[in-house]
């Protein structure tokens, strides 16, 4: 009798876990794309401003105050002379011009308090001597060295009164104010040596360069075209580094040409330690594949792969990587596309991290019609000028944002919304300044 054996059960492979996404993604259009503004707002909603720190007042210039700063006492705390001149009691001048002049003798060795009817020499910023309440300029002296007056002098003329700027407890600086040298001087005059501000965000740029095989191919073709020696530069990373430094943040750049996913993952994790934002750039083009950074992000934390209604830069990648949920944004390949995404998304992120409000929009009128894309926001390099007192834009070169020559001739990048009809002459467009 034949023996029938039960077939061995083959275990089905476990399905791969879905990549961890990020919550609250905005709605999309019929093509599954977000608008540029919605995507920007979404990214900014995922980050918080850098925690405030106490900074010495002179070093806080350009930073945003994180609390109201109150005067600890009257500012100024004492009454001082505003000008170099002579201090005296204004009451001794009340008869000047009724009908004749009044002469005030200058006391060369002033007593304390000053004798009524006399004046003493003072310097700007010095305390008013006891018994005086005004300061007169030296051009009122006659040939004998006495002060000659033909009209009474008002009390506190030429003086800066104690508490005349701020009284004790008054607000010197409001929360959110950007500190400039004038505000710094007020804080210092009030005796405040430290202020709570948001520090400049720490940004790490991870530049993924062409790998050795791609580099060798580039050099081979360059030699065939007569270029014996070409510098190994990354134009995308250079453009983004310069744009980031222009925003007055702390920038570190890390370059790599690794082809190893594990090495790149380790590099990104190290970049995130101590950073407030990681920006990934790449000049490595692999047709039909994700850029090298995007492919390693899902295991590192929540990742958002989005399609945005914009050209260039339709594919956008953002992640919050461990440890610490550090924001990381991946920029498209190429200086122009990367700059567009930087202006559209990275700059607002950095302002949010810095505790600053959104940047004011610069508008300029078109000098001629500009073509639109029917479904996507596009971007045009432009030059700016003032015509009749109004800002006017004109296309730089061929107006191709992917062309570095056009970018080099531009002052700004104009944002052209989608539409079936060209932008008419004279219509204002939002512009992002390049410098």
Task: Please place each PLM-identified region on the residue numbering.
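Short glycine-rich anion-binding loops that position phosphate/pyrophosphate groups of nucleotides
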Residues: 93, 125-126, 210-211, 283-290, ...
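Phosphate-binding glycine-rich loops and their immediate beta-loop-alpha structural context
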Residues: 158-281
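Short Gly/Thr/Asp-enriched flexible loops that form oxyanion-binding sites at enzyme active sites
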Residues: 280, 287-301
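Solvent-exposed alpha-helices and their adjacent loops that cap or buttress functional pockets
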Residues: 79-81, 94-98, 111-115, 128-129, ...
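Phosphate-interaction motifs
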Residues: 2-193
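Flexible glycine/proline-rich
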Residues: 53, 57-58, 67, 80, ...
């Amino acid at each position: 009798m034949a023996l029938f054996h039960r077939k061995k059960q083959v275990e089905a492979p476990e399905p791969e876990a879905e990549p961890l996404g990020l919550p609250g993604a905005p709605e999309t259009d019929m093509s599954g794309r977000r608008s540029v503004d919605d995507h920007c707002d979404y990214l900014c909603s995922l980050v918080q401003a850098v925690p405030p720190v106490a900074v010495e007042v002179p070093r806080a210039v350009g930073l945003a105050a994180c609390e109201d700063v109150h005067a600890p006492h009257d500012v100024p705390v004492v009454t001082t002379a505003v000008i170099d001149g002579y201090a005296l009691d204004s009451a001794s001048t009340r008869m000047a011009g009724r009908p004749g002049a009044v002469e005030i003798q200058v006391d060369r060795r002033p007593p304390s308090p000053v004798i009524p009817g006399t004046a003493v020499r003072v310097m700007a910023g010095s305390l008013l001597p006891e018994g005086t309440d005004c300061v007169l300029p030296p051009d009122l002296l006659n040939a004998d060295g006495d002060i000659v007056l033909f009209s009474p002098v008002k009390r506190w003329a030429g003086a800066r009164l104690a508490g005349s700027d701020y009284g004790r407890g008054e607000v010197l600086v409001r929360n959110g104010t950007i500190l400039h040298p004038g505000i710094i001087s007020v804080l210092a005059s009030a005796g405040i040596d430290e202020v709570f501000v948001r520090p400049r965000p720490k940004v790490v740029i991870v530049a993924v360069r062409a790998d050795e095989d791609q580099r060798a191919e580039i050099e081979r073709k360059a030699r065939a075209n007569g270029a014996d020696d070409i510098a190994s530069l990354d134009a995308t990373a250079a453009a983004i580094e310069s744009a980031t430094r222009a925003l007055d943040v702390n920038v570190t750049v890390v370059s790599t040409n690794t082809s190893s996913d594990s090495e790149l993952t380790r590099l990104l994790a190290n970049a995130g330690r101590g950073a407030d934002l990681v920006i990934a750039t790449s000049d490595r083009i692999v047709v039909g594949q994700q850029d090298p950074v995007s492919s390693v992000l899902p295991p590192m934390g929540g990742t958002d792969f989005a399609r945005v209604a914009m050209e260039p830069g339709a594919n956008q990648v953002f992640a919050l990587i461990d440890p610490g949920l550090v924001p990381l944004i991946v920029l498209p390949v190429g200086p122009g596309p990367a700059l567009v995404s930087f202006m559209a998304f990275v700059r607002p992120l950095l302002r949010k991290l810095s505790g600053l409000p959104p940047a004011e929009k610069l508008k300029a009128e078109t000098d001629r019609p500009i073509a639109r894309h029917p479904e996507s926001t596009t971007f045009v390099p432009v030059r700016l000028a003032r015509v009749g007192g109004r800002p006017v834009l004109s296309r730089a070169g061929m107006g191709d944002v992917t062309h570095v020559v056009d970018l080099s001739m531009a002052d700004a990048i104009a944002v052209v919304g989608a539409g079936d009809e060209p932008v008419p002459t004279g219509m204002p467009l939002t512009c992002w300044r390049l410098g």
